[in-house]
Amino acid sequence: MYMRKIIHIDMDAFFASIEQRDRPELRKKPLIVGGLPRGRGVVATCCYEARRYGIHSAMSANRAYKLCPHAVFVKPRMVLYKEVSLQIMAIFREYTKKVEPLSLDEAFLDVTEYLQINGSATLLAREICALIKLRTDLSASAGVSYNKFLAKIASDLKKPGGISTVPPEEARQFIDRLSIGKFYGVGKITKSKMQSLGIQTGKDLRQYSKDFLMKRFGKAGSFFFYNARGLDERPVCPYQNRKSIGKETTLVQDTNRPEEIRDILINLSSLLGKALENNSQLAQTLTLKIRYSDFTTTTRSLSLQKPFSCPADIEECLPSLLTNCNLTHKPIRLLGISLSKLTYIGSAPRPIPLPFPKDRRSNCLNRFFAIKEESP
């Protein structure tokens, strides 16, 4: 039987570890990377010292401060994190072309061909983690198994800096003991539904038929059925076609001031234009998202006949989307823009990349908001 060798490598507290690496005075202190506690920010990540206080990613910075008042808060340095991530991904590709990044700090590696017949994936994972430490001075954990499902779960077992292996002959016993909340795709709601059926572990899950699970959980039920039996045929995909990209920002203070709204939209357009350029992509549909101070949310979408790629094109679409939005009646809390119907350059007609000057880029929004531009 053909058996794959899959490694899942996950950096340990990636953002926080970079900050502690670069600033030795932050080591062994409860460090939180993200928003500041007096604002509306959230925790992007935190070091293991901070996790002992119950702090975790996506928690509000204010809540994190209450749990640990002496924690050190630092703002993210995303440009640096992306640079380090590229360095780590390059290390992975020294061993295999089959690398599937899941985020800046984790990836799947299919090392089946590299190891050929008798090579040890566990020893290789140890070698890769050691090389990451040597070149970046950062710690990584790894999970090794014959499919993605088990490799990803295994990588979390001995954090930080550990390596866990689930060989085929031990998979069933491993899954039997596995808490249902550890299964891929099982969030709080699904976990609650499963527990109401008496499903607490992988062993419990395996007692149910595929048809039953699909009736209760839709298409995900089929995935749960096979995972409970240690089966996951998903390949490691080096290039994933993203269906959309988006950027949004939560304002420090609610506002309906035209100048602030304009500046935020221009910034979001620039970020998305850069993302399209970096990914060699074009977009054809733009969606604007507005969340007001009362948490009501409005979205407006526009599809163009020809794909676009530059910030000026994005900005010129916005006035028609803003026309039907209530921008003055109540303050705005959040603004976001997303792009969809993405195609890669070469598979679609490419627009002519004109060097649009900055004044043209902002004129369309200025006219919409009736803002009088300052004379030079």
Curated annotation (Swiss-Prot):
Active-site residues per Swiss-Prot or TrEMBL entry: E106
Gene Ontology MF terms: damaged DNA binding; DNA-directed DNA polymerase activity; magnesium ion binding
Reaction(s) the record says it catalyses: DNA(n) + a 2'-deoxyribonucleoside 5'-triphosphate = DNA(n+1) + diphosphate
Cofactor: Mg(2+)
Role description: Poorly processive, error-prone DNA polymerase involved in untargeted mutagenesis. Copies undamaged DNA at stalled replication forks, which arise in vivo from mismatched or misaligned primer ends. These misaligned primers can be extended by PolIV. Exhibits no 3'-5' exonuclease (proofreading) activity. May be involved in translesional synthesis, in conjunction with the beta clamp from PolIII.
Subunit architecture: Monomer.
PANTHER family, per database record: DNA POLYMERASE KAPPA, DNA REPAIR POLYMERASE UMUC / TRANSFERASE FAMILY MEMBER
Protein name: DNA polymerase IV
UniProt organism field: Desulfotalea psychrophila (strain LSv54 / DSM 12343)
